[in-house]
């Protein structure tokens, strides 16, 4: 059958709330608009657009686990000193990708904060897209797999698995869930 794989997504962000969830629920939407939305400067492509800048997203990622990143860079330095170029190259590859964060359109970011984290419209059965109600229970002939990271500090354990609760039309035989032990949010996507 057709299949749908959901990985590390906050389908129901009320399950196992993380620091990300708490920030989104403790601040009103206007706070995000005033504090994290910026205009792309004139000398950059996309000038004049309102965005949630990639550098702020990156700063947020680093701020969630500063000790881990400091230790990772210390280990990288030690690998270079020891001549362990394989581990040093693995560090470089990881951070080349981890640091590649793009600006997000303001409309998308703010709508995500409101719909997913503040109003929980999908799990409450109240999300409309283009004037039509989204009804996950209507999915019948598509297999569903959900994947979560045991240590995910962005989409907590249970937030993605919640898709199974919403997709009531999918037979049990066409459902599977995997919790990747020892994996965080980035880890479930990077292996």
Q: For each predicted feature, which ranges?
A:
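Glycine-rich phosphate/ribose-binding loops and adjacent secondary-structure elements
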Residues: 1, 148-149, 164
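Catalytic histidine-centered segment of alpha/beta-hydrolase-like enzymes
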Residues: 154, 177-191
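C-terminal structured domain segments across diverse proteins
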Residues: 113-114
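Conserved alpha/beta-hydrolase "acid-adjacent" motif
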Residues: 153-162
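Short beta-strand/loop motif that positions the catalytic acidic residue
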Residues: 139-141, 145-148, 152
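Short, conserved loop/helix-junction motifs that constitute active-site signature segments
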Residues: 136-141, 167-172
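Active-site nucleophile elbow and catalytic-triad environment of alpha/beta-hydrolase enzymes
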Residues: 117-136
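Alpha/beta-hydrolase-fold enzymes
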Residues: 2-107
């Amino acid at each position: 059958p057709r299949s749908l794989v959901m990985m590390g997504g906050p389908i129901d962000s009320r399950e196992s709330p993380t620091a990300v969830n708490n920030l989104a629920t403790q601040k009103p939407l206007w706070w995000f608009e005033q504090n994290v939305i910026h205009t792309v400067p004139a000398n950059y492509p996309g000038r004049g657009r309102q965005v949630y800048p990639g550098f702020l997203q990156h700063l947020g990622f680093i701020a969630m686990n500063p000790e881990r990143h400091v230790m990772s860079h210390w280990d990288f330095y030690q690998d270079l000193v020891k001549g362990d170029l394989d581990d040093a190259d693995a560090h470089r590859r990881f951070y080349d990708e981890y640091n590649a964060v793009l600006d997000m359109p303001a409309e998308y970011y703010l709508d995500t904060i409101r719909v997913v984290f503040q109003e929980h419209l999908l799990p409450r059965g109240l999300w409309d897209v283009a004037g039509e109600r989204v009804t996950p229970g209507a999915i019948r002939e598509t297999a569903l797999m959900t994947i979560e990271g045991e240590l995910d500090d962005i989409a907590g354990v249970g937030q993605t698995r919640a898709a199974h609760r919403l997709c009531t039309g999918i037979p049990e035989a066409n459902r599977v869930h995997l919790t990747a032990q020892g994996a965080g949010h980035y880890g479930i996507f990077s292996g």
